[in-house]
């Protein structure tokens, strides 16, 4: 029953920056730069619904579908800076089956902030974006935290708009050379955006396995994932493993169009994993998920994926990534800690 709106976004940026300090040492390394960035957002007035006979306009009485999103054009001049004090620990069997990877121990902070210098009539703001990474542990146990926040302080309404928050807390425990346990908690939120957008359980990165067709969505989302993985030594040329997992999630309506406060939803399942050749970082995975608590439209799901999770700590959910201001380069203050 949800509706869709036409959204057009354009962005541009130009910046310069330089590094402070020597990254080959264990001391603090910094970054400082400036950025000219701009964005244009336009949302269509009509809300439509996809039906078997084509697109159908939603009725005017549907206030959620008729919510107004004024067009916005803004150019900002910002300063970007950050620092990191990090050393790397080489571990094996965390995000890959047996391959080695570097885990960052320490702290990293990046900040970008600046006012609008040209904007749609009557609009003026100060844009702020920040990112924090922290890691601690050794080859047997490791914990990582990443938080990324952005928003615009509207100078006329004295409020915040375009708020986007993404965060992930992970814990790894290597019980033996063949046994690894992982726990991941992901919290995401969007509020007062300049265009309609919802968070849901359907997102491949940020959603719940077994809940691809529930249709529930909102402005805030919490996901807890627990996995218990065992290596199976069946072939010297490749690595194989089996894992049991459970996903638990909840949605809050927030101010998202058609947003709802969901029940606590959960699924359990079995994963078959492989890497080729033996010691390879690329992971081939089949997830078999069965919903146990939640929406009636949830159902058994088979999911295939191929990825290399050793290269970056977190691949941000797609629905959160597209909510972010397009003119903020992802590499500003966001040095990959792995």
Question: What kind of feature is each model-predicted range?
Answer:
Residues 1-76, 82-87, 91-106, 120-121, ...:
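Gram-negative and organellar
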Residues 108-338:
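C-terminal transmembrane beta-barrel domains of outer membrane proteins
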